[in-house]
């Protein structure tokens, strides 16, 4: 069985080689360096591509090595903007519990609880109306989800016993 799997895998790898983008970078010293600017640009492009890849994945691997943001300023500018957009999407979807943990150059700052209370007490102006309504809908959806979760937990406790 294992031999059959090994032979099939080898046949597929020979028949369908991975695309050029998936192959390792050729680091042989036989090729002459033509332009020093080109040599400096390639790490920036690779860093940018890697950051975009981790942003798309949601950076699930927190221990992954990251390049320092000051190393490639143009790459860090794109990554900052992408992380801001990602955080905004997560906040709007209600997936971020504590926005303060994203504190830094890459994220939005959390509002103080007093400012949140003041905003909820004041009637929203026309520009904030959309966000006010969105916030209300998200709060209602969260409350409904908690009620449903509590109901399902009660059912499970009744079925399995206390």
Swiss-Prot record:
Q: Which residues form the signal peptide?
A: 1-24
Cellular component GO terms, alphabetical: extracellular region
Keyword list (alphabetical) reads: Amidation, Cleavage on pair of basic residues, Hormone, Secreted, Signal
Q: Which InterPro entries match?
A: Corticotropin-releasing_fac_CS (IPR018446), CRF (IPR000187), Urocortin_CRF (IPR003620)
Principal place where this protein is found? secreted
Q: Which cysteines are joined by disulfide bonds?
A: none
Q: Which residues form the propeptide?
A: 25-119
Query: Does the UniProt entry include the keyword Disulfide bond?
Result: no
Q: Single GO molecular-function term?
A: hormone activity
Compartment(s): Secreted
Phenylalanine amide-modified residues are: 160
Question: According to the UniProt record, where is the region Disordered?
Answer: 57-79
| Family named by the database record | Belongs to the sauvagine/corticotropin-releasing factor/urotensin I family.
Q: What does this protein do?
A: This hormone from hypothalamus regulates the release of corticotropin from pituitary gland.
Mind telling me what this protein is named?
Answer: Corticoliberin-2
Identify the species of origin: Catostomus commersonii (White sucker)
């Amino acid at each position: 069985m294992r031999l059959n799997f090994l032979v099939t895998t080898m046949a597929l790898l020979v028949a369908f080689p991975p695309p050029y983008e998936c192959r390792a970078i050729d680091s042989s010293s036989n090729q002459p360096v033509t332009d020093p600017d080109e040599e400096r640009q390639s790490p920036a492009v690779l860093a940018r591509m890697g950051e975009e890849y981790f942003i798309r994945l949601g950076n699930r691997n927190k221990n992954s090595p990251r390049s320092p943001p000051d190393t490639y300023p143009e790459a860090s500018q794109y990554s900052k903007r992408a992380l801001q957009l990602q955080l905004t999407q997560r906040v709007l979807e209600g997936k971020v519990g504590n926005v303060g943990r994203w504190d830094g150059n890459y994220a939005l700052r959390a509002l103080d609880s007093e400012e949140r209370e003041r905003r909820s007490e004041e009637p929203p102006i026309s520009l904030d109306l959309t966000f006010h309504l969105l916030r209300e809908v998200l709060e209602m959806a969260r409350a409904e989800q908690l009620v449903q979760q509590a109901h399902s937990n009660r059912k499970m406790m009744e079925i399995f016993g206390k």
